[in-house]
């Protein structure tokens, strides 16, 4: 083990020597750059661009380009990057992660690689975790880029597609991780190229990279549409039922946070819902509601997993940052179950139209880099998943913070008493204190205890995150006491007020260990920035969540031996301290394994998504006739239909092929069994294909010109692809839930998911081609002289696709072109148009 550790340390030292050598070369240009006038320094940007066009690589330009940015930052911002910041910038340019401590100037470090990579003209995305940081960094650092002649854009959720397109066309674009992901998904749902906003993904530099690529790796970005549902009463009934249960009626598995009914609970459910067998196949939907109601009531905790806003909305709390996750909902009906539990309005369920995880989103960039102060503990995952190395960068000044040994107490009560006493003592001498908590519930509890002790303080958690910047700004002032969840102002420095250094600097107090050592290190890193004095102290108890869920029998035995009199005594035990770290490592390992498994499943979706999106993009950007592609689909559809009946009785086969041809290819009266008898399969295929080509040409002749034809072809393909892809995503989700049980049959669930997912994808492609064929052959196309051909083509395709989706039992001569939403549908169904063939449009 010591040999491995020694090798790792030597590798890090060797890497730092290489970086220092390049950094010195950058520094060698300092005097020359300082001697240049503003105009001459600004002229370096077009010079570099020209040199790049002439064949010089970005690596060859690096020393000069970095030196230009250093000098520009000095003139514009009054800041001059240190050598360690240059080294960090080189690591970023190489597509790796420099681990730089809090307060070491990561934002300024990023300016050098961002400028260098922007010279290529393909766009650089600077990714932050929230819009406040995006706006702040784009405003401050944007001054340097603009001064050097580069354009800077900010991509915010509230911007219109036109404004977003403008932001993405800039040399440098600041955005949040979620907005970049959603823009990518939305771009792959549009019908016209001019509605797309992003360029091809080139270089992303991710701030707080561990938060985005590790903590949120499993978080899927989902674009979904509402599904009409009358199931709200079922959510309420299921909720009313589970609230009648006693603790013996359900079983909770604490480590996995899963729950199920016990035998007595099943008996109660059958009695409550008047059923003979709860788990009969016809009750599958009901058991889904009951399972979600159980989770909502006995697993999901108010103020820990979610909060209720003043507007009565359920907001998810991010377990890593403590922030509420606006716009996000628990999936699979759990969110609706929580809404029923809390008695707020139940919102409709939704159907996923497109989704992607951050893991696969950011792996699509040509080059990916990131910055953080805490990543070394996740080095293996960065390397395995993202092919990124973690390079620890030395601090500019030695760290003066004192990290005290953890103080361990027997109970939560004794721990909190000690925390309050410590805070009070420091407050009375004027030393600022930041108290870090894992949950909103804990921050509220400590706040209440501090009020009782007469200590004025500020609370920063998911309930008042809008005051974050102001609270963090004052957290380093004399006598300030701040309670914060893990959000603790990542990306915002806590600057010490006058006279605070002499008092020992900011003291960070952790009230329990997080599941991840990295999050603990982030909390510690709030103190002792840039060589400032500071302290950190963690208070733990044997009743903490981490110890309760992952502690060993030895800890439980230790607890049993404790007397009530011993409650307030600090426990000094190396064994228990090791158990804490061991529990954290175990959780980190479990989380990594889970993320790896998620990636294995998501890679199936990724491969399929890339095929669909690439073909979709090809259709959208096409300036050519798409006839050859559509004809190929028609040919394959006919071949599949004929081949499907080749092994059946010949008479039955001919009858089935005739039925297919009549419903999907030709007018009914124009083909019969007599015409196909005596022909071989290949001859039947050729005959049907020739008839289809005649109808295809006849259909397109109804459109005015080539532009209208191309628009019709595009919308025809895109609407059907989108419809089928949405259904396929839903089917893959269901498959994923189903294959999990196959592990009990000694089958590998991932392998099963891969093989069945591939077969489902092939089936979906066949279904797309069948619908394109049927719609192309059977659509009622009318020329609209007074309307733009493109608008007409879009409407016609949408209506005909919806017609095919609803069924074939309608009046095929009906004209839908001038029907208002509340008119009777021309298909004579008796329904209003908006509820029949106009349903897709409205």
UniProtKB/Swiss-Prot annotation:
Q: Which annotated residues bind ATP? A: 85, 103-107, 493
> Where is it localised?
Cell membrane; Cytoplasm
Q: So where does Zn(2+) get bound?
A: 825, 827, 836-837
Q: Which PROSITE patterns match?
A: SECA (PS01312), SECA_MOTOR_DEAD (PS51196)
Keywords, A to Z, come to: ATP-binding, Cell membrane, Cytoplasm, Membrane, Metal-binding, Nucleotide-binding, Protein transport, Translocase, Translocation, Transport, Zinc
Per the record, its GO cellular-component terms are:
cell envelope Sec protein transport complex; cytosol; plasma membrane
Comment on bound cofactor:
May bind 1 zinc ion per subunit.
User: What cofactors does this protein use?
Assistant: Zn(2+)
Query: Matching Pfam families, A to Z?
Result: P-loop_SecA (PF21090), SEC-C (PF02810), SecA_DEAD (PF07517), SecA_PP_bind (PF01043), SecA_SW (PF07516)
Q: What NCBIfam families does its record include? A: PRK09200.1, secA
* Protein name as annotated: Protein translocase subunit SecA
UniProt source species: Streptococcus equi subsp. zooepidemicus (strain H70)
Its ancestry begins with:
Bacteria, Bacillati, Bacillota, Bacilli, Lactobacillales
What is the primary gene name for this protein?
Answer: secA
């Amino acid at each position: 083990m010591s040999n491995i550790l020694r090798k790792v340390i030597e590798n890090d030292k060797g890497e730092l020597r290489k970086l220092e050598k390049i950094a010195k070369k950058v520094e060698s240009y300092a005097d020359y750059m300082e001697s240049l006038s503003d105009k001459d320094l600004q002229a370096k940007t077009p010079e570099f661009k020209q040199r790049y066009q002439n064949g010089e690589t970005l690596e060859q330009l690096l020393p000069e380009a970095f030196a230009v940015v250093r000098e520009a930052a000095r003139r514009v911002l009054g800041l001059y990057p240190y050598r360690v910041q240059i080294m960090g910038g080189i690591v970023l340019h190489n597509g790796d992660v420099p681990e730089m401590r809090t307060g070491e100037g990561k934002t300024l470090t990023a300016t050098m690689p961002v400028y260098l990579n922007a010279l290529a003209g393909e766009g650089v995305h600077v990714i932050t975790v929230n819009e406040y940081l995006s706006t702040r960094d784009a405003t401050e650092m944007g001054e340097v880029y603009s001064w050097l002649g580069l354009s800077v854009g900010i991509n915010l959720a509230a911007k219109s597609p036109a404004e977003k397109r403008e932001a993405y066309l800039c040399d440098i674009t600041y955005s949040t991780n979620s907005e970049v992901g959603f823009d990518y998904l939305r771009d792959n749902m549009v019908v016209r190229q001019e509605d797309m906003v992003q360029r091809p993904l080139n270089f992303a530099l991710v701030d707080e990279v561990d938060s985005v690529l590790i903590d949120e790796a499993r978080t899927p970005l989902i674009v979904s549409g509402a599904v009409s549902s009358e199931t709200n009463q079922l959510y309420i009934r299921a909720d009313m039922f589970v609230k009648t249960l006693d603790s013996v009626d359900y079983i909770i598995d604490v480590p996995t946070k899963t729950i199920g009914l016990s035998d007595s609970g099943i008996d109660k459910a059958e009695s409550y819902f008047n059923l003979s067998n709860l788990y009969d196949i016809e009750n599958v939907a009901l058991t889904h509601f009951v399972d979600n109601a159980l989770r909502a009531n006995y697993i999901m905790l108010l103020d820990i997993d979610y909060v209720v806003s003043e507007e009565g909305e359920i907001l998810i709390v991010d377990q890593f940052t403590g922030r509420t996750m606006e716009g996000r909902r628990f999936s699979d009906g759990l969110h609706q179950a929580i809404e029923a539990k809390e008695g707020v309005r139940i919102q409709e369920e939704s159907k996923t139209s497109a989704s992607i995880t951050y893991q696969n989103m950011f792996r699509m960039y040509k080059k990916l880099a990131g910055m953080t102060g805490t990543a070394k503990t996740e080095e293996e995952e960065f390397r395995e998943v993202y092919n990124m190395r973690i390079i620890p960068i030395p601090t500019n000044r030695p760290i003066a913070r004192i990290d005290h040994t953890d103080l361990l107490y027997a109970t939560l009560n004794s721990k909190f008493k000690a925390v309050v006493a410590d805070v009070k003592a420091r407050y009375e001498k004027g030393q600022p204190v930041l108290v870090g908590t894992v949950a909103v519930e804990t921050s509220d509890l400590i706040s209440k205890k501090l009020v009782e002790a007469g200590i004025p303080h500020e609370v920063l958690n998911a309930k008042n995150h809008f005051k974050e910047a102001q609270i963090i700004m004052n957290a380093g002032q004399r006598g300030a006491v701040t309670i914060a969840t893990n959000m603790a102002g990542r990306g915002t420095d806590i600057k010490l007020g006058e006279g605070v250094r002499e008092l020992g600097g900011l003291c960070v107090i952790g009230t329990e260990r997080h599941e991840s050592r990295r999050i603990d290190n982030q909390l510690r890193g709030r103190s002792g920035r840039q060589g400032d004095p500071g302290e950190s102290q963690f208070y733990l108890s044997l009743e903490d969540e981490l110890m309760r869920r992952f502690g060993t029998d030895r800890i439980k035995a230790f607890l049993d031996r404790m007397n009530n009199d011993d409650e307030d005594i600090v426990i000094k035990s190396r064994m228990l301290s090791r158990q804490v770290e061991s529990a954290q490592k175990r959780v980190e390992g479990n989380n990594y394994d889970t993320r790896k498994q998620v990636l294995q499943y998501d890679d199936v979706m990724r491969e399929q998504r890339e095929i669909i999106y690439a073909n979709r993009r090809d259709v959208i950007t096409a300036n050519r006739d798409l006839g050859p592609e559509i004809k190929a689909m028609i040919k394959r559809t006919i071949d599949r239909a004929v081949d499907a009946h080749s092994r059946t009785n010949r008479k039955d086969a001919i009858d089935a092929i005739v039925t297919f041809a009549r419903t999907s290819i030709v007018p009914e009266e124009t083909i019969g069994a007599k015409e196909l008898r005596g022909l071989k399969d290949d001859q039947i295929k050729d005959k049907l294909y020739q008839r289809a080509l005649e109808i295809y040409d006849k259909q397109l002749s109804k459109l005015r010109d080539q532009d209208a034809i191309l628009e019709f072809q595009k919308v025809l393909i895109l609407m059907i692809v989108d419809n089928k892809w949405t259904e396929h995503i839903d089917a893959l989700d269901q498959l994923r839930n189903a294959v999990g049980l196959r592990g009990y049959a000694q089958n590998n669930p991932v392998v099963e998911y891969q093989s069945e997912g591939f077969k489902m994808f092939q089936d979906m492609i066949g279904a797309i081609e069948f619908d394109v064929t049927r719609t192309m052959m059977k659509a009622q196309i009318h020329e609209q002289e007074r309307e733009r051909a493109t608008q007409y083509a879009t409407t016609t395709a949408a209506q005909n696709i919806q017609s095919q989706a609803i069924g074939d039992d309608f009046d095929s001569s009906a004209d839908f072109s001038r029907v208002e939403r509340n008119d009777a549908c021309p298909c004579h169904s008796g329904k209003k148009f908006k509820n029949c063939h106009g349903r897709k449009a409205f």
